[in-house]
Amino acid sequence: MKFIIAPAKKMIRAQDDFPVQSQPKFRVQAGELLLLMQQLTFSEAQALWHTSDKLTQTAYNQLQQSDLTRQQSPAIFSYSGIQYQYMAPDLLDDAGLVYIQQHLRILSGLYGILRPFDGVVPYRLEMQNHLPLPHHRNLYDFWGNRLYQALARMPGPIINLASDEYAKAIRPYLQAKDQFIDVRFAHRVNGQLKTRATYAKMARGEMIRFAASHRLTKAADLKNFDSPTYRFNAHLSTATQLVFIAK
């Protein structure tokens, strides 16, 4: 069983409490993308990121100084969005950390696909950003089936905890033999099911922590996820989607 999740826009340079254990599989390709980004003007970068002048200036300065080989920190501690805060990987025991290194993959616009302890540096590039590429239409085209192939080499079903933006980098390449299971966290609003993004991000992080803490190996075991907000709904779930409804 392997989980896929999205990265976070907000990144930090993590402290040295947890060392880098591995390098990104597609570090060469990430270097190519970084070089293209570093050639952008301030205005082009702002158009790419859709950011304010102040945020663009900070990110642009960081971009010009970026070096993928220096001042790395583990990916799992470098992303600091809501999902990662609720995952709380720093609170996992050693066996839990080994579990996420083996079973969790982070999809990334810049790096393609990451293991939790791959060394990364802060960057700003979402999969849906329209970075001008010389031989490709967009980042989905740039990465092609490489991210799927990396997942396909791992045993077991793919548990999709990623946003649609990042799951789109995998879905087109799925084969009949693949077991791809979406996880949905929803609220009942006026008789309809609605996803509330912030709560869903919290739950995704908590589910990863739950799986790591219990060393889960079967997708069916995720039905026992003890979320403070959501409960598994067997009636709405299918073989390809696990549905959790707000209590």
UniProtKB/Swiss-Prot annotation:
This is UPF0246 protein LCABL_22600. Belongs to the UPF0246 family. GO terms for cellular component: cytosol. It comes from the Bacteria. NCBIfam families: PRK02101.1-4. Disulfide bonds: none annotated. GO terms for biological process: response to hydroperoxide. It comes from Lacticaseibacillus casei (strain BL23) (Lactobacillus casei). InterPro entries: YaaA.
